[in-house]
Structures are given as C-alpha cells and as structure tokens.
Amino acid sequence: VFLQAGLSKLLDPDWSAGGFLGGLPEANPFIELFTWFAGNTAVIDPLVIYGQVLIGLALILGVFFRFTALAGALQMLLFWLASFEGGITQGLPVEHGYLVNDVLVYALLLFGLGALGAGRLYGLDRKLEEHSLVEKYPWLKYLLG
C-alpha cells in the first residue's frame, strides 16, 4: 500500500498534498493543523511521498520494522484525522464507516505488527539483530522488528 501510493505520487508531477488538505470541511476539529500543512506543501509533499516510499520498502524488506510500522501508523492516523467529513461535532459517519474506516484499520494493524516485532519473522531485522553494532548498542533493538 505505502510503496504503491508513494510511487504513484512521485511519478505524478501535478500531485500535491495541498489539493487534499485544502478541501477539508471547516468543521473538522483538526482544520487548523491541516490548514498549516496545506500552507507548507514544500515540506509536507516530500515528507508524504518519500515517507510512503521508504515505509513501503522497509515494511517489505522487514528492516527497522518497529520504527517503520510506527511511522506508517502515525501517517495513517493523520490521514484518518483528516477524513472526518464535517467533523465529529457535525456528525458521523466518516467516509466508508461511522468512525472506523480503512485508514484506521491500516494504522491499528501497523501498531500491532510493530508491537509484535513482526520484522523478526522473515525480515532483515532478524539478521541485523545479530550484528555487533546492535550488541554494542542494545537500544537499537527497539527500532528493529
């Protein structure tokens, strides 16, 4: 999901987060945050594009899985907060559901996979944990899968 989304944005010269962020309902309780994002697309666009590409690659390879899963979940949570159509105060449902939509499901799955350390099963994190650098700096294990 992340890799495909990031690559499609990267290959589209007209893509900008400003288009999405500028069209949010005014009643969204987080409108000030997303209005700030919309005014800073020179920073936000590369963060979204390259973030999605790197998150996608890292999840596929199983490298720095916990950190990557957390980063992906946080990005999904921001997308979820932006998805309130009319805002919570203006009523529900949000698109595709009452409160839970596909974006929230992705975020919860990523939090769960990161908490379980899924990168250790078949990912590169299994090999990275055996590296002498990780033995020297044990805190690195918290970033690995």
Question: Which residues make up each language-model segment?
Answer:
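Substrate-binding/active-site groove segments that recognize
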Residues: E26
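Extended, low-polarity transmembrane helix blocks
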Residues: V1-G23, I31-L54, L61-G145
